Every structure is written in C-alpha cells, then in structure tokens.
C-alpha cells in the first residue's frame, strides 16, 4: 500500500520545547487523528509536514516526496491545508477569493468551490470580515477541497463550532476519503470527533509520540478496570497504563493481554483512554 505520509525520527527544538523522535507512516486512503494537550506539538508537527518550518532531524515524505526536495513546492498543489485561524483578506468576498485562488492552484475547480459555498450556505458576496468563525472555517474547507488535493492537513478545523456544524464538516472529510487515493491528517481537542472519523490515532505528549495505532486495534488492546483501591494496586504494573482514583475506588486503563483472566475488563472509549494515559504519563 502506498503511503500518504512517512515520518522518521523527526525533531524540532524551540526554547522551552522540543519535538523528539516522531515516526509513523500513514497509509494512503486513511484518516489520521492527531491528539494531545495544548503545547504537545501538534501544530508544530503540521508546520513541519507542510514545509513551513524546518526540522532539525529525521525525514518527512509527503505523497512519496521529501519535504525539502526541489519538487516539493509543486507537490503542494496536491495538499489542502486548513488552519485553526483561516486567513483570507477581510475585505474580500467569497466570490472575489475564488478569483485569487484560481490564479494560485493549477488544478483549481471553480464549480466544486461554488458547490461547497451552496452546500455550506455561505453567501458569495458577503465580506470575509462579516463571517462568523464557523463560516470562516467552512470557507477554508471549501478552498482546500477545490483544487484536487490528495492530502488534507487540518489543524483544529472544528474547534469552537457547535455540534451540528461539526458533524456537517466531519461528513465532508469522510466523503473526501471515499476516493482511496486521498488521505487526511486532522488535529483536534475534540476526541469524540476523531473517534467517529479516524482510522488511525497518534497521541503527542510534551513533544513525544506516545503511540500511533489503528483506532480499532487500540481500543481492542486496551480496556478499563473499575475496582477498589486494593484490587487496583494489585494489578500487574506492566498492565496498567494510567489510573484515576476517586472516593469510591479506581478506574485503571490496562493492556488486556497482561491482566489476569479473573479480572473483569470493560471496553474503554477513546476519550477516557487518552485522559487516563495522560494521567499515567504525569505520574511517571
């Protein structure tokens, strides 16, 4: 299977923060959810993949091509990007922006763009300055999907939006990857969105990649033990990934394969899995 993204031992250093040794391969036709706390390095990683920031170690291949190769600038025509803040000129309308974008992308599809404006109920002749946050994100997504991109890089595209708008946008991303030559990397704080949408999950914590796993395999390999304190403390140390202790006992995230058979292990949702994993990392 071809790869949409290949990262090998990628690092980047800033004063007070380091992204260290990030490696993963995203198969073509799949959606990767990138999760982590604020400051974990999600936006830094996306900038490195875009080539907007220069890495200090490792290698990055996008759609089979090295990020710092001579032809990467041309390859960007096949990458759609939506950032947390969509920056279009405030005085331009969506119709005027179409003319700008038409001159930017060689594969620009005006019909697709205006179809998305209609689908998203975006007024073509209203200045961008008068758009709400949700409207701004929708316009950015319309632009990213209108130049035959094979890879979408999305940094918090649903942050701050109401649930109905989020569901509408997630459906668009899901439709995008029905063509198996297309792939998506999406970072989000809203884990429930990623649980619905993604094939793979990558979890960054303080600049380190704690895991990159197929979502379903991750949820099958881990589980939740709800128990009293004594039982929780008796669990094999290698089996426990993180615990939360409350007044009525413990909730422990465990590796199913390492837990004794007589211990009841419940299914765990992705959001609780990540929360307990963060607690476990903080206690190490």
Which residues are covered by each model-predicted region?
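A short, proline-enriched helix->beta-strand linker immediately N-terminal to the Walker B motif
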Residues: 146-150
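Catalytic Walker B motif of ABC-type/P-loop ATPase nucleotide-binding domains
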Residues: 152-156, 161
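Helix-to-loop junction immediately C-terminal to a conserved catalytic motif
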Residues: 50
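Conserved beta-strand
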Residues: 7-10, 17-27, 58
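ABC-family P-loop ATPase nucleotide-binding domains
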Residues: 77, 81-139
């Amino acid at each position: 299977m071809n790869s949409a993204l290949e990262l090998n031992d990628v690092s980047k250093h800033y004063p007070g923060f380091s992204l260290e040794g990030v490696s993963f391969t995203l198969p073509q036709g799949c959606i990767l959810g990138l999760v982590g706390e604020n400051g974990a390095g999600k936006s830094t990683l996306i900038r490195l993949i875009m080539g907007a920031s220069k890495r200090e170690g490792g290698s990055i291949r996008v759609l089979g091509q090295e990020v710092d190769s001579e032809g990467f600038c041309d390859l960007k025509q096949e990458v759609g990007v939506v950032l947390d803040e969509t920056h279009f000129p405030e005085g331009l309308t969506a119709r005027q922006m179409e003319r700008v974008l038409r001159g930017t992308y060689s594969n620009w599809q005006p019909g697709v763009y205006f179809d998305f404006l209609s689908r998203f109920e975006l007024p073509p002749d209203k200045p961008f300055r008068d758009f709400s946050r949700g409207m701004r994100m929708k316009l950015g997504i319309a632009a990213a999907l209108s130049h035959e991109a094979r890879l979408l890089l999305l940094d918090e595209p649903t942050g701050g939006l109401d649930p109905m708008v989020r569901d509408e946008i997630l459906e668009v991303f899901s439709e995008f990857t029905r063509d198996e030559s297309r792939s998506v990397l999406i970072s989000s704080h809203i884990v429930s969105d990623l649980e619905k949408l993604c094939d793979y999950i990558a979890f960054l914590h303080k600049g380190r990649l704690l895991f990159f796993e197929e979502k379903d395999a991750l949820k099958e390999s881990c589980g939740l033990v709800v128990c009293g304190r004594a039982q929780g403390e008796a669990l094999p140390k290698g089996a426990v990934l993180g615990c939360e202790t409350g007044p009525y006992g413990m909730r422990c995230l465990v590796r199913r394969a390492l837990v004794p058979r007589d211990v009841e292990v419940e299914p765990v949702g992705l959001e609780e899995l990540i929360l307990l994993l963060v607690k476990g990392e903080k206690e190490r």
